[in-house]
A protein has these predicted regions:
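Short, well-formed alpha-helical segments that are part of the catalytic scaffolds
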Residues: 12-27
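Acidic donor-binding loop at a coil-to-helix junction in glycosyltransferase catalytic cores
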Residues: 182-188
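Acceptor/aglycone-binding surface of glycosyltransferases and processive sugar-polymer synthases
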Residues: 62-64, 68-81, 98-182
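A conserved acidic beta->alpha catalytic loop
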Residues: 36-45
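Cell-envelope/extracellular polymer assembly enzymes that use nucleotide-activated donors
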Residues: 4-6, 31, 187
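Short beta-strand-to-loop acidic/aromatic patch adjacent to the donor-nucleotide binding site
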Residues: 84-95
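Donor nucleotide-sugar binding loop of glycosyltransferases
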Residues: 14-17, 39, 97
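Short hydrophobic beta-strand elements that form part
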Residues: 6-9, 33, 61
């Protein structure tokens, strides 16, 4: 496809993990925007000084901590300025496999009626078995609360941050109405 694909990665307290994530982002991704949200571990500098720093990587350093939603919105705005076609958001903690980007981008490319696609961390049973108990049960609770408040019962992992969005629909969103913090995922 000729669709320009960009990836936005908000980082805070990620550290060296970012190198593995950046190294595994597939070659068909045109641009990568890493948003260092005043990370005390210096994740932006770690990425900047690593072999993963290629010409497709742009590192943006926020002057103050904006929260995960605020950091993603900074990345989204940059992608819109650069005429990205589809924008993928993936967390910097390497919780999601960047090799799965194709699975959330392809439905948007192949179906002109589809503008947004959300990943599911719990699709594979092996992933659930390896998930820390506190995070697993916390996600169950947050997912239930999100479904209860939104009415979207068919979304299996509503607080998951692995998403793809068509830039044409992203341009229509009012970023002021989208949370700058953790509720960003639910607002989207």
């Amino acid at each position: 496809s000729n669709t320009k694909i960009s990836v936005v990665i908000p980082v805070f307290n990620v550290g060296e993990t970012i190198i593995d994530l950046l190294s595994n982002i597939p070659d068909y991704v045109d641009k990568i925007y890493l948003i260092d949200d005043c990370c005390p571990l210096g994740t932006g500098k770690i990425a900047e000084n690593s072999k993963a720093n290629t010409s497709r990587l742009t590192i943006i350093y926020n002057k103050k901590n904006l929260g995960v939603g605020g950091a993603v919105k900074v990345g989204y705005e940059k992608c819109l300025l650069e005429d990205s076609g589809i924008i993928v958001k993936i967390d910097g903690d390497n919780q999601m496999d960047p090799n799965q980007i194709k699975k959330i981008v392809d439905p948007i490319i192949s179906n002109k009626d589809l503008d947004y696609c959300k990943g599911n961390r719990f699709l594979e049973m092996i992933e659930i078995e390896n998930y820390p108990s506190i995070r697993f049960y916390g996600n169950i609770f947050l997912s239930f609360m999100s479904k209860l408040s939104s009415g979207y019962w068919d979304i299996y992992d509503p607080v998951n941050g692995f998403t793809a969005i068509n830039s044409n629909i992203l341009k229509k969103l009012n970023f002021d109405k989208i949370d700058d913090g953790y509720y960003f995922e639910s607002d989207m």
